[in-house]
Regions:
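Iron-sulfur-associated redox domains of electron-transfer enzymes in respiratory
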Residues: 1-200
Length: 200
């Protein structure tokens, strides 16, 4: 909708809580460029509670430690998610319980096939999946990842010389898939990206 309306000078994605904090604390002039939408974690949590009732507990599993602060420290999303476990914490939990995931039987999740939306956690995944096939109006789509690159972009945006762009921005290089609690030492970025893209 935001892209079709075309009212914003630039649009900065608000999926990454580290990006949101960075802008709000160090680049406050750019706050009007932030997409006025909650993160996918918050949106999904709210959707689950609207379908199954307010007394259901939602637990988010992922590679991002910043999501913990988002869930408890950001008034805009408070209550959407009840607990957050990182992949690292889950792995340690399984180990403490003597669970070897490789010995477990595969079970289908029973959810609808997410299709291209599985690309979301890799750099450029929002553009490739969520915005794929949408009318982007006059906006040029760009994805930026890595803290240094994000800061360079924000400095350029503060100068006011860049217009009519949609920026998908992630602090983690490679996107969420390479988050700090993703067991990243076990898999290269290229391998992680290939594994996700093969599933689509």
């Amino acid at each position: 909708r935001l892209l079709k309306e075309g009212k914003m000078t630039n649009i900065i994605s608000t999926c990454c809580p580290s990006v949101n904090d960075l802008i709000e604390k160090y680049y406050p002039k750019l706050v009007p460029m932030m997409a006025p939408v909650v993160s996918p974690m918050a949106a999904h949590g709210r959707l689950i509670k609207s379908i199954y009732g307010g007394d259901v507990k939602v637990v988010f599993l992922g590679p991002c430690i910043a999501k913990k602060e988002e869930a408890i420290g950001d008034e805009r999303v408070r209550g959407a998610v009840d607990a957050i476990l990182t992949f690292e914490e889950i792995t340690k939990w399984w180990s403490a319980q003597g669970i070897d995931i490789h010995q477990c039987e595969d079970q289908p999740a029973g959810n609808p096939d997410p299709g291209v939306n599985q690309l979301y956690p890799i750099s450029g995944g929002v553009i490739q999946s969520v915005l794929a096939g949408t009318d982007e109006g006059h906006y040029y789509k760009v994805h930026i990842d890595g803290l240094k690159n994000c800061m360079e972009l924000f400095e350029e945006l503060e100068k006011g010389e860049i217009q009519d762009c949609f920026f998908e921005v992630n602090v983690c290089e490679g996107g969420c898939i390479k988050g700090p609690a993703s067991d990243k030492w076990r898999q290269s970025l290229v391998r992680a990206k290939m594994d996700i893209e093969k599933q689509v």
